[in-house]
């Protein structure tokens, strides 16, 4: 199936910006180019606060969103996409606002350190550390300590899945759920969706390979399940999961496979496949009808309707 009309128009608008692929410029230039793209605003909320969370000797900037005050809320800790190289709390502000308002959850968006200046495991440690900090400081945040979820899109989905695995391994606390939006879960570039979507879209196979090279120290890192969650040996006892995938996306196949692996381990997992859309569509609420549908599905999952 070809891109639907709205997605095709969006792709043409992005191409008209004439921005070079991320793998052909420096990481700094890639960030500047990404930041220059128009951002879609999100809804107004009664509480939005920037904060720094101190983890040992590292200060991690975060932004906390609440859809209502004077109430103990559930929370989703959100990790933005961008191949571990680009992206920011500012760039994902609209997404976080829509998630918070639509679900009734607090959202804590994490500005983890970026590669290649900071390679694995530091960005991952930021994400796990912030999630654990939320658990330890739930009363201060007016958050339900037993109802903490994680989520993210693309590389943020990778980080969310990895945080879920480490939380399971450490057994200090349990997560309520994980929301994975076209997550990057493996470094196998021979999957059919990598070949079929090698070029022509926002995320291409060469760009994705470049992202992996920026994040990892050496090919040996790719054997670490916290880098490639698909390589985790046993998915039993993981929290309920929703995975959203796009058919015009190199990462499509691994999202479907991860869902199937979770089902095989008797984990409650929901997979929603969107056709006619490309990687990145989730952040286009107000532009793409299917982005609004994906946001609604995500919020319903968090609420417990899915």
Give a label for each model feature.
Residues 73-82:
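Short beta-strand element of the alpha/beta-hydrolase
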Residues 90-108:
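Short amphipathic alpha-helix adjacent to the substrate-entry channel of hydrolases
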Residues 162-306:
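Alpha/beta hydrolase fold serine-hydrolase catalytic domain that processes acyl esters and thioesters
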Residues 135-150, 170:
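Gly/Ser-rich "nucleophile elbow"/oxyanion-hole loop immediately N-terminal to the catalytic nucleophile
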Residues 1-65:
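A glycine/proline-hinged amphipathic helix-loop "lid/cap" segment
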Residues 152, 156, 160:
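Gly/Ala-rich beta-loop-alpha elbow adjacent to hydrolase catalytic centers
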Residues 118-140:
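Alpha/beta-hydrolase active-site loop
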């Amino acid at each position: 199936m070809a891109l639907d009309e709205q997605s095709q128009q969006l792709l043409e608008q992005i191409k008209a910006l004439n921005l070079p692929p991320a793998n052909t410029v420096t990481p700094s230039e890639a960030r500047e180019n990404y930041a220059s793209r128009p951002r879609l605003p999100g809804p107004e909320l009664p509480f939005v606060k920037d904060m720094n969370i101190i983890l040992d000797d590292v200060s991690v900037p975060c932004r906390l969103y609440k859809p209502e005050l004077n109430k103990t809320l559930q929370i989703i800790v959100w990790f933005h996409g961008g191949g571990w190289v680009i992206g920011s709390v500012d760039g994902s502000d609209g997404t976080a606002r829509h998630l918070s308002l639509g679900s009734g959850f607090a959202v804590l968006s994490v500005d983890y350190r970026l590669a290649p200046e900071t390679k694995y495991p530091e960005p991952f440690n930021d994400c796990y550390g912030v999630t654990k900090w939320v658990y330890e400081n739930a009363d201060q945040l007016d958050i339900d300590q037993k109802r903490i979820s994680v989520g993210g899109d693309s590389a943020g989905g990778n980080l969310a899945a990895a945080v879920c695995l480490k939380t399971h391994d450490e057994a200090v606390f349990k997560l309520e759920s994980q929301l994975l939006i076209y997550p990057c879960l493996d470094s196998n570039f021979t999957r059919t969706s990598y070949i079929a979507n090698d070029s022509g879209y926002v995320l291409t196979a060469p760009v994705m390979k470049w992202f992996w090279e920026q994040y990892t120290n050496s090919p040996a890192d790719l054997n670490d399940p916290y880098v490639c969650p698909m390589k985790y040996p046993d998915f039993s006892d993981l929290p309920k999961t929703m995975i959203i995938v796009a058919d015009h996306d190199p990462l499509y196949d691994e999202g479907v496979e991860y869902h199937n692996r979770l089902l095989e381990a008797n984990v409650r997992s929901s997979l929603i496949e969107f056709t006619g859309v490309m990687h990145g569509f989730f952040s286009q609420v107000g532009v793409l009808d299917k982005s609004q549908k994906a946001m609604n599905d995500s919020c319903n999952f968090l609420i417990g309707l899915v």
